[in-house]
């Protein structure tokens, strides 16, 4: 779903474990492209419903495996670089408008299954320190990642 300003409505997921680490996943066949799970909100879905759907589609977890600890107060935006905009596809998407969720893993991490869906998004995952993703995510997402982690840090370390 794309809003009137050309932003695709989306949810982002920060999944943390009991060691104050966050799940970091590599995009399928994109050796240097790592990110948090995220995905679009379908028409008729709430952000929370989209988050649970994406959680299952991308890392194979369901609502019983996690607990929502927090969500961002505001929607976060990032613009795509011009070379990544698909100019011939309508409506044109200029970037993402995201609601982020902080989740605590309740199950063992052996439940994480990045190949639970035939069209899987990721081919590897690992636990990383809290601030690691900000230095490693693709440049146009860094500001959003920084804001998200600043909003969630107190909850993660408590």
UniProtKB/Swiss-Prot annotation:
Keywords: Hydrolase. One of its GO terms (molecular function) is mRNA 5'-diphosphatase activity. Residues 6-150 form the Nudix hydrolase domain. A motif (Nudix box) lies at residues 39-60. GO terms for biological process: mRNA catabolic process. Accelerates the degradation of transcripts by removing pyrophosphate from the 5'-end of triphosphorylated RNA, leading to a more labile monophosphorylated state that can stimulate subsequent ribonuclease cleavage. Belongs to the Nudix hydrolase family. RppH subfamily. This is RNA pyrophosphohydrolase. It comes from Blochmanniella pennsylvanica (strain BPEN).
């Amino acid at each position: 779903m794309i809003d009137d300003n050309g932003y695709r409505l989306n949810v982002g997921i920060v999944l943390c474990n009991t060691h104050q680490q966050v799940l970091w996943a590599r995009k399928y066949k994109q050796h240097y492209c790592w990110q948090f799970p995220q995905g679009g909100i379908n028409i008729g879905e709430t952000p929370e419903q989209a988050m649970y759907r994406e959680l299952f589609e991308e890392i194979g977890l369901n609502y019983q495996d996690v607990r929502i600890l927090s969500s961002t107060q505001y929607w976060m935006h990032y613009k795509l670089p011009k070379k990544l905009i698909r100019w011939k596809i309508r409506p044109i998407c200029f970037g993402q408008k995201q609601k982020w969720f902080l989740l605590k893993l309740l199950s063992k991490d052996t439940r994480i299954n990045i190949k639970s869906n035939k069209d899987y998004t990721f081919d590897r995952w690992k636990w990383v320190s809290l601030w690691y993703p900000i230095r490693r995510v693709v440049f146009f997402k860094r500001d959003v990642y920084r804001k998200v982690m600043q909003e969630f840090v107190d909850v993660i370390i408590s």
